[in-house]
Structures are given as C-alpha cells and as structure tokens.
Amino acid sequence: MIMTDFIDSPYVRDMAQTTENLYRHGWDERNGGNVSLRLTKEEVEAYAGTDKVLRQIPIKFDASELAGKYYLVTGTGRYFKNMVEFPERDMGLIRISEVGNSVDLMWGFNDGGEPTSEFPSHLMSHIARLKQDPDQRVIMHCHPTNLVAMTFTIPLSSKRFSRTLWKMHPESIVVFPEGVGVIPYMCPGTNEIGEKTAAKMADYRVVVWPHHGVFAAGDSLDETYGLVETVEKSALIYTTIREQGGEVLQSLTDKDFRDLIKRFDLKANEDFLTPDAVGATVD
C-alpha cells in the first residue's frame, strides 16, 4: 500500500490554513505569532516521511514530562502569510526526546529552521492543559488588535477583563465561561513568561499578555481559532463603544449571565459572576 506523504495530511493543511487566517485577520503581522498542535503516534505513523529523525534540536526547557509526544509547530522567524506555499519550510513535526531538553525533527524545517522561540512556553502550557483535559491539543499565540488595546485602558485583572468581555455579547460567556486569565507584562520569549502563562492555563483557556497578545488552548485548530475570534469580537465591540463616546445606556446584566448559564448548562467562573465593591483589587 502506498502511504500518503505527511505534507498532504489534514494536519499540515489545517495548520497552513489556520495560520493564513490569523495573518489575514491582522493578528500575526510579519513573523509574529506561533501555533503548536499535538499529534498521536498513530496519526503520525499513518503518513510517509515521518519515520526517521532528521536532526536533533536543543530546547531551553525540560520537557521530559512530554517525552515521546509529537507536535506540529510553526518555525521561529517565519511569516504566517507564507505557510500555505511553503509548509515544509515554515513548520516542522517534532518529537520530544526522552531526556526532555531536545526534540527530534521528523519532518519539515527543510532549510535548517527550528521551532518558534516561544516553544518552551507552548510546552509548559500543553503540560498545564493536559492535566485539566487530556483532549487538549492546541496552543495558539497571536496578537488580536482590540484585545491588546484593552490592556492599555482596563486594569490588568482577570475578573475585570472577563466581566467586560462577557458583557459585550451573549456568546462570550457561552464560549469562555471560565473567563480569561491576565498576567502582568513580561518580556516575551523567556521561560519566566511561559511559567506564568502555564500557571494561568490551569484555570483558563485564554491568557492575556498585556500590550502583546494572547495564548489560547483548545481541542482542535478550529476550536482554538474560534475561541480567539470570540474574545476578539467582544474586544472589538468594547472598542467601538469607546469610539462612540463610551456612554453605555444598557448592557448584559448579572441576571442575563445566570440565564445563559442555565440555558446552556455552563460551568461558569462563580468568582466572576458578581462585580467587585468599589475600590476592590482582584487578580
């Protein structure tokens, strides 16, 4: 039986299409943004060209907890607008080594490339999310314009951000009933920001990086993309309200939240369902 080449797999196709959509939205300019997708051994071995280690690539993180797991990941310095045309150059299929401080390249990065510089942060978040849900496969980092803008105008509080976004549209609490996590501004590309993000990923599928972007998690590329889309739509509505003068005459209420929770049988974040007292500070 002739096996299909990995480049023609739905995983490569979907990754290329998703990253192009992120670029078209304006959320991943230049080489901004990165995505990783966990694949099973069976999914990988069903395709030709994935059975030999092409080279080993060191990583600055002990990922031994994920030893043997496969990830399709975008490359460092690569432009998402080029992924559809050059998938074998701009993404790679890697396997975490047993010792955890390197990865085996099984496919891709055919010009000598390496995984995104944020890959340690991805792996930390994959570890955190797998502990919450074994079906979680995707970590996505991008720069949604309106959500980033909100980090300049709203206190950097998970509760304040979540309630503000929930109030913008009824789909918000339905799609991210746990809310969104917010961390302080930190230098990107470091293990420190990865650790802080992973800690929030224990409770949230979306973590806001102030003045920068988001990390989001999901079961599939489509689901994770849709999660970011929904968060950004709420942020766009918030931005549009401010452009119209900022006066809000009516909006979704806490009772409306409760009605949505009941209607869609949601496990919402109870801590975020009531506003704080004036002057209160929360994470």
From Swiss-Prot:
GO cellular component: cytosol
TM region positions: none
Gene Ontology biological process: pentose catabolic process; rhamnose catabolic process
Statement: the UniProt record of this protein carries the keyword Cytoplasm: yes
Textual note on the cofactor: Binds 1 zinc ion per subunit.
Localization of this protein: Cytoplasm
UniProt-annotated binding residues for Zn(2+): H141, H143, H212
Molecular function as annotated in GO: metal ion binding; rhamnulose-1-phosphate aldolase activity
Record keywords: Cytoplasm, Lyase, Metal-binding, Rhamnose metabolism, Zinc
Keyword rRNA processing (UniProt): no
Pathway the protein contributes to: Carbohydrate degradation; L-rhamnose degradation; glycerone phosphate from L-rhamnose: step 3/3
Pfam families xrefs: Aldolase_II
Catalytic residue list: E118
Reactions catalysed according to its record: L-rhamnulose 1-phosphate = (S)-lactaldehyde + dihydroxyacetone phosphate
Cofactor entry: Zn(2+)
Entry EC number(s): 4.1.2.19
InterPro entries in the cross-refs: Aldolase_class_II_sugar_metab (IPR050197), Aldolase_II/adducin_N (IPR001303), Aldolase_II/adducin_N_sf (IPR036409), Rhamnulose-1-P_Aldolase (IPR013447)
HAMAP family named among the record's database cross-references: RhaD
Recorded family membership: Belongs to the aldolase class II family. RhaD subfamily.
Biological role stated in the UniProt entry: Catalyzes the reversible cleavage of L-rhamnulose-1-phosphate to dihydroxyacetone phosphate (DHAP) and L-lactaldehyde.
Name of the molecule in the record: Rhamnulose-1-phosphate aldolase
